[in-house]
C-alpha cells in the first residue's frame, strides 16, 4: 500500500497501478488455496499483463478467447502467469507490436486446455524436440518446468504442457488438464 500511495502523491498513476496489481498477485501466491477457478486465474493474469504493459508500453497486445464456458473450472493456481511471462520474454524478444493470445477450450477427450501463443520466431527445432519428448528442463525455463511438474503431480503423466510452433510463426504452449468444475457455494 505504501508504494501505491507514493505513486498517487507524486502523480504517477502507473506506480500506484503496478503496486496494487503486484500486491494482489503476491496475496494469491501466499494463499493456502492450491486450486482456483479459471475466472480467478484469469483475473490474476490480467493483473500480471497490466504490469507488463506498463513495463513494455505499446510493445504487445493480448487477447483471451474461448474462456466463457470454462470460467468455473478448477485449476491449480498461478499456472498461467509463467506461460505468458515466457511468451513475453522469449516470444516477443525485443520486438515491437507483438501479440500474445490465450485460448481456452476442450479437447476431443473432454479435457480442458489453455493455450498461450505468441507471434515471435517460435521455438528452435532442437528445443522444440527436447520439450516435446521430455518437457522443459529446470535450466533456463524454470517457470515452464514448474507448471509442467505441478500439472503432472496433480493429474498424472497424461497431463501437463504441450509445445508446438504456430502454423505461420510463434510458439504455442498448451496446458492440458482434466475438466473439473468447481462445486457451487451457497
Named regions from a protein language model:
Residues 1-164, 170-174:
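Two-component histidine phosphotransfer core
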Residues 163, 183-184:
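Small/flexible residues
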Residues 178-182:
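Two-component histidine kinase transmitter core
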Residues 126, 184-186:
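Short, charged, solvent-exposed linker or helix-capping segments at domain edges/interfaces
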